Amino acid sequence: MTTPKEVIEFAKENDAVMVDMKFIDFLGTWQHFTVPVGEMTEEMLEEGRMFDGSSIRCWQTIDNSDMKVVPDLSTVKMDPFYEHPTLSVICDIQDPVTGEDYSRDPRNVTKKAEKYLVSTGIGDTIYVGPEAEFFLFDDVRFAQGPEGGFYSIDSTECPWNSGAEEMGGNKAYKIGHKFGYFPSAPFDQDRDIRAEMVLTMQDMGITVEAQHHEVAPAQHEIDFRFDTMLRSADMMQWYKYIVRNVAIDNGKTATFMPKPMFSDNGSGMHTHQSIWKDGQPLFAGDQYGGLSEMALYYIGGILKHAPALAAFTNPLTNSYKRLVPGYEAPINLAYSNRNRSAAVRIPVVDSPKGRRIEYRCPDSGANVYLAFPAMMMAGLDGIQNKIDPGDPMDVNIYDLPPEKLNKIAKMPSSLHEAMEALKSDHEFLLKGDVFTKDVIDYWLNWKMEEEVKAIDSRPHPHEFELYYHC
């Protein structure tokens, strides 16, 4: 759908009584408000509606608060999680005075990135395919205050419940630590919930390729087909929305938090990327791994800027509890053919059209409307400056002796380190005005003040075990 008349007709055909207007905030959370379908006029669909931008995190001040949401008519769908038939549309944010797209609207950053790619002449399309893992729990509790803090997670799949008394009796079949990859029923207890998620995605026009249990107990993955950067980012938001709501409908709770469970694998968002021009794949060639020279330079840019990229691809303090040795997390900045211990993997493919690179460091805590463009900008910088990625690492990097391992560059070990890296390395993001200095500065300030310092200033329960009797 591309015209207001088509959208209004679609609403009538589906008996919609409400219109839900969704938009992404600066940190990556969907916000929304809903209007009766009678308010959905052609004028409203073309011009948008006003709202208070000062009430959204990281946006306007109260003395300059008026903002406008403008529907992107190509994103119209029926939302399956409302009792009353509700049409949903993703919106862009504009300044109502100038009519210009708002610089801190993350979706605007993605749109500018796609335009910048075309302007370089390098390619006309970038395809992105994220693989986002998540956990499903039966019970989650947490609290934090001056008097104490705790968290508690639970799933009937988890091994600590092997001795628990359960309603109707404990039937065993728990999943041990790091033994959850591809188990069949009855170990895979939430298989039907995943299937419901997939069917819901398909009903909404999302092409799903596969779904399965992941390595950790209660951990899962559903893979949808790659698409252009903006459409893939939009699908990622629907993906999270569907997973969370189907989980709630089935008495579960879903999280995309990178590391909710100590001593087991965390959740990543491995991101496949390829550039095309005039319908031809530019990453296919006769170099290492079947890649083109351009693709190798793209990898060089990713690896060079990876510490700064981490500020967007791994933007949570919790992200760095996943990026530690021993849990299949790619902390070593190297590339390789088929090798999952490297930060960049070159998957085996059947044809040149499938030739791509997979960046394995990101996690789903990322705001994909910022993370996808940041990765592309790093890769393009590699192409523009012919950055050599070095020699591939065709060994299990985790097994290298310390003297060799220490020569390989590493991902940051904390969000603070990632922010410092971004502070000193962000010029590549400013090309084409894709990221503005304001966006980078605001991101740095928010993450440091509201997250890094907030975590650093609070006692941790494990500190009591270590230090109470000091």
At which residue positions do the language-model features occur?
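Glycine-rich, acidic/polar active-site loops that bind/position phosphate-bearing ligands
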Residues: 1-470
